[in-house]
Amino acid sequence: MPPGARYSRHEAFSSASLSTAVSELSVETREVGDVTLLYPRGFINAHTVRRFEGEIQKALEQKRFKLVVNCEGLTYIASAGLGAIMGAIEEIRGNGGDLRLAALNETVRNIFEILGFHHLYRIFPSEVDAIRSFRDAPAAS
């Protein structure tokens, strides 16, 4: 763990069935300098999106406007998850920050490409590349 990094772990489960894989999501967060990293694991859908939104909102309440969503553990993202990202981006970019995506698997990457989200958000092959991008270039506007 890098110096100064902080972790938190939260889990959300659908009330319909804890055993249904599509209803499970955990979100870990970590801070590296002025960048907040989010690690969603599982599925972001209508049953789990509040946990994901809550972690984004916590970062914004702490005036942390540089976010990287590491999608390595994300199995699937439904429209509710995409809406959570879209819902936060105006505030993030309005405060000089950005939300960047890293380590997308093929399924998640295809969803973003089909919907044209790869034109709206910077996508990086690794978390390290996404973090570095905040130092190398200004935030999107």
Predicted features and spans:
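Amphipathic alpha-helical interaction surfaces in cytosolic regulatory modules
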Residues: F43-Y121
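A charged, well-structured terminal subsegment
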Residues: I123-S141
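Conserved catalytic submotifs in the C-terminal HATPase_c
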Residues: V32-D34, E72, L104, V128
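Residue-level signal for pocket-adjacent positions within structured domains
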Residues: T20, Y39, E72, H119, ...
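Short leucine-rich amphipathic alpha-helices used at interfaces
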Residues: S26-V27, T107, R135
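General small-molecule cofactor/ligand-binding pocket signal
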Residues: R30, A102, F124
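Short beta-strand/loop segment at the start of cytosolic alpha/beta domains
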Residues: P2-Y39
